[in-house]
């Protein structure tokens, strides 16, 4: 990411994707301001958006045909507070609008069965994310960060709307030549309503683990 800091006011302008987002495979871009508040921590506010649209099936329930893909775009705002009141607590809140170019979920099924399920399966709408974490720093430039994660999808289709609650544990180690970051996540997802095509909710227990290795100054470039 690109950053510029005004030394007198300790105000920073930033643009790009933060490394803590990238290691979670969240490539949302940010344009915003970050301000040091003395011993009260660092607050930041930013616009969030995706430069490269994500591709999904326009109708994931279509069968017997070649499915077509569609782009998903999102934009919104994020507020973050690092080192809350001088502590090792970190928090952020993100809200964004999700817009699909061609949302056709359930349309083929409706045409074949004479139903009216498409509105319940609409994936356009709003997403809200909250995270509260605590950082432990210990010997050898190592970091351990447990976090509570909450996500709510208030989508136009009630059968696609859901709430996520989870726990995440991040471990990081930084060396002079390389760095390593790993994440362990477990959570639950509960949908507001049953999927009308399958007659049941797609509630799920979630588990994820990932690791990212960084090599500094590759080919001598800083």
What annotation goes with each model-predicted range?
Residues 75-138:
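Solenoidal tandem-repeat scaffolds enriched in leucines and small polar residues
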Residues 2-4, 31-35, 77-83, 130-136, ...:
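Residues on the lipid-exposed face of transmembrane beta-strands in outer-membrane beta-barrel proteins
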Residues 24-31, 54-64, 96, 101-120, ...:
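Outer-membrane beta-barrel translocator domains and adjoining extracellular loop/strand segments
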Residues 46-99, 183-208, 222:
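Outer-membrane beta-barrel translocator/channel fold
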Residues 25-29, 71-77, 124-130, 159-165, ...:
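Residues that define the transmembrane beta-barrel architecture of outer-membrane proteins
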Residues 1-12:
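Outer-membrane beta-barrel initiation region
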Residues 6-8, 17-21, 47-53, 85, ...:
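Transmembrane beta-strands of outer-membrane beta-barrel pores
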Residues 11-15, 41-45, 87-93, 142-148, ...:
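Transmembrane beta-strands of outer-membrane beta-barrel proteins
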């Amino acid at each position: 990411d690109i950053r510029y800091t005004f030394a007198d006011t300790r105000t920073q302008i930033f643009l790009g994707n933060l490394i803590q987002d990238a290691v979670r495979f969240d490539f949302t871009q940010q344009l915003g301001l970050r301000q040091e508040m003395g011993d009260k921590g660092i607050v930041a506010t930013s616009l969030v958006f995706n430069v490269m649209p994500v591709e999904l099936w326009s109708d994931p329930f279509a069968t017997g045909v070649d499915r077509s893909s569609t782009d998903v775009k999102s934009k919104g705002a994020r507020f973050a507070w690092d080192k809350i009141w001088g502590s090792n607590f970190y928090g952020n809140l993100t809200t964004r609008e999700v817009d699909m170019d061609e949302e056709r979920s359930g349309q083929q099924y409706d045409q074949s069965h004479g139903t009216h399920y498409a509105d319940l399966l609409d994936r356009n709408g709003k997403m809200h994310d909250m995270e509260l974490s605590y950082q432990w720093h210990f010997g050898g430039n190592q970091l351990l960060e447990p976090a509570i994660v909450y996500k709510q999808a208030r989508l136009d289709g009630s059968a696609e709307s859901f709430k996520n609650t989870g726990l995440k544990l991040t471990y990081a180690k930084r060396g002079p030549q390389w760095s390593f970051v790993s994440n362990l996540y477990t959570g639950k997802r509960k949908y507001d309503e049953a999927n009308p095509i399958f007659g049941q909710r797609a509630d799920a227990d979630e588990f994820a683990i990932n690791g990212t290795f960084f090599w500094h100054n590759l080919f001598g470039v800083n």
